[in-house]
Amino acid sequence: MSYPGYPPPPGGYPPAPGGGAWGGAGYPPPSMPPIGLDNVANYAGQFNQDYLSGMAANMSGTFGGANVPPNLYPGAPGGGYPPVPPGGFGQPPPTQPSVPPYGVYPPPGGNPPSGVPSYPPFPGAPVPGQPMPPPGHQPPGPYPGQLPVTYPGQSPVPPPGQQPMPSYPGYPGSGTVTPAVPPVQFGNRGTITDASGFDPLRDAEVLRKAMKGFGTDEQAIIDCLGSRSNKQRQQILLSFKTAYGKDLIKDLKSELSGNFEKTILALMKTPILFDAYEIKEAIKGAGTDEACLIEILASRSNEHIRELNKAYKTEFKKTLEEAIRSDTSGHFQRLLISLSQGNRDESTNVDMSLVQRDVQELYAAGENRLGTDESKFNAVLCSRSRAHLVAVFNEYQRMTGRDIEKSICREMSGDLEQGMLAVVKCLKNTPAFFAERLNRAMRGAGTKDRTLIRIMVSRSEIDLLDIRAEYKRMYGKSLYHDISGDTSGDYRKILLKICGGND
């Protein structure tokens, strides 16, 4: 580049063809324009070219030079500046190439025209060939596929407005991309549906006859109540009292016993009231059935949990949160209270930038630190939407090479571990979660009958067909088969009726 007051470099550019201000016979001008040195005679000859070269070389050695690898920047079409010599700036240029087309070289004192690369910029400078942005504006981004300019060893500069992402092993940073993620669907395949041709008064009469006189026709009760939806059973209750002036629930209690009675009475409660009584039973007396609390609060919908709070307060004159606080403690208590709010995000959209942030925070709260920040797991697992968390679990697996469940097992223990695992399993695959619970209820010596009854009744109109399929897939035997082998009598009959068939 030529500047006024400096002699032209050796091998300078010959005049470009054509006329005009910057070419033709008038270029270069016969004399330099006045620049304030008019009184200095022969000023151009006063500068020693060797001195200039030596000064530049000295500066290059002092400040580290600016050695640029050859071919780092592509040349402009039709020619352009020659590559920087290996010795750094200030060295005599090599032989110049052929004359480029008109307009490629800048005017004296100017910059290269748009589209012609210049020397490597400083970090944060505009991409070569692009103008400086106006004050207050961010410089434009690099060309597609080109990394932002940085100092050696410096991490790439994030786009304007985006925070730099922390570095985690095996986890590349990503922008705020929001791809379309299909929403996770809840199961809606129950074994019990509304009976066709339903007549509540006729069913009330059938039940009356089954309990009248000496003995009880348990099979008639099983056939009637085991094939009606909960909504229809509530109508039977009303019709029974209307027709006979008696409470059907009291009659059933007086005629039935054992686990068969418990199953029939569970069928007669509304789903909300049934859960309220199950929670009450889980926390009353000595000891707490933590697994019951976890199962109910981790698997129910927001609407169900909000209605459960109302029903609990009505039935037992204290809030569900007060009941939880009185019988649990620590991080497990906080988990249950968070779940009992029924306030999980229910959107189906997934923002992958938020997914990546949650993955990083979970990793930093557990695997990437000494100890565990349980509150961070609680905040993410209890508030984010189902679709969002499924994406988080998949991304966590990709980043760490470890399933989120394995990380929870490594970082937590006791009731908190079981609670967090239940939340994750329900979000991943609710039918598989209940299939595992059913298998554990019947595994080994003895049967956890309350768990067996609760799951069979509460899921009978939601996803019991899906639970059956998962059970067969996970354990190689049908749910029907295992119930048959682990129960007996009328209790077995009503459970098999609810199960709806063998797989």
Swiss-Prot record:
SMART domains assigned: ANX (SM00335)
Intervals holding Annexin repeats: 198-269, 270-341, 353-425, 429-500
One GO cellular component term noted in the UniProt record for this chain: vesicle membrane
Main location: cytoplasm
UniProt keyword DNA-binding present: no
Localization per Swiss-Prot or TrEMBL: Cytoplasm; Melanosome; Nucleus envelope; Nucleus, Nucleoplasm
GO BP terms: cytokinetic process; phagocytosis
UniProt-annotated stretches for the region Disordered: 1-35, 56-178
Lineage top rank: taxon: Eukaryota
Comp. bias regions, Pro residues: 1-17, 80-145, 155-169
SUPFAM superfamilies hit by this protein: Annexin
Transcription as UniProt keyword: no
Family from the record: Belongs to the annexin family.
Subunit architecture: Interacts with PDCD6 in a calcium-dependent manner. Interacts with KIF23 during cytokinesis. Interacts with S100A6.
Task of the protein: Required for midbody formation and completion of the terminal phase of cytokinesis. Binds specifically to calcyclin in a calcium-dependent manner.
Domain comment (free text): A pair of annexin repeats may form one binding site for calcium and phospholipid.
Descriptive protein name: Annexin A11
Organism: Oryctolagus cuniculus (Rabbit)
Phylogenetic classification of the source organism: Eukaryota, Metazoa, Chordata, Craniata, Vertebrata
Gene name for this UniProt entry: ANXA11
